[in-house]
Amino acid sequence: MSMWKGQAFSIAHADTGAFEGAGLRPFFEYRQLGIDTATNGAFGAHVIRAVPGMKSEGAWHSHDLDFQMVYVTQGWVVFEYEGQGEHVLRAGSCVLQPPGIKHRELRHSDDLELIEITAPAAFTTRQEGAE
């Protein structure tokens, strides 16, 4: 495999990737975009979509990572960030969630779909209470 600065060429098409339920949240399905493999785990990217009829638990949590960006492609989602309040993200909205920020997903539309990019690809999540 050819590598450029530790990265391999990678392309993912919507009609060849499968959504899987095995992810961080049971009310979402995840489709990996191959970025984790192409970067040896330095970055991760996946499409996340809502499982219709399932709702968020609204639990406060934070992630131990260096970068996390969310871009909504369809539907809407309401996040609450500690010290930043509630924010409605709609199709076209983008949020950078700084490392360690406490947040929770309060509710979402059944047609929610978003792209999440993280560094690194694998990271730990801590369940936390709000302060």
Regions found by a protein language model. Name each.
Residues 2-13, 104-131:
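Double-stranded beta-helix
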Residues 18-61, 66:
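A short glycine-rich, His/Asp/Glu-containing loop-to-beta-strand
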Residues 39, 78, 123-124:
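Flexible, glycine-rich phosphate/dinucleotide-binding loops
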Residues 46-49, 93, 103:
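Hydrophobic/aromatic beta-strand elements that line small-molecule binding cavities or substrate pockets
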Residues 47-50, 62-79, 117-120:
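Short, conserved beta-strand element in jelly-roll/cupin
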Residues 65, 85, 101-102, 110-111:
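A generic "binding-loop/recognition-motif" signal
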Residues 80-82, 106:
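A generic structural motif
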Residues 83-100:
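Short acidic-glycine-tyrosine-enriched beta hairpin
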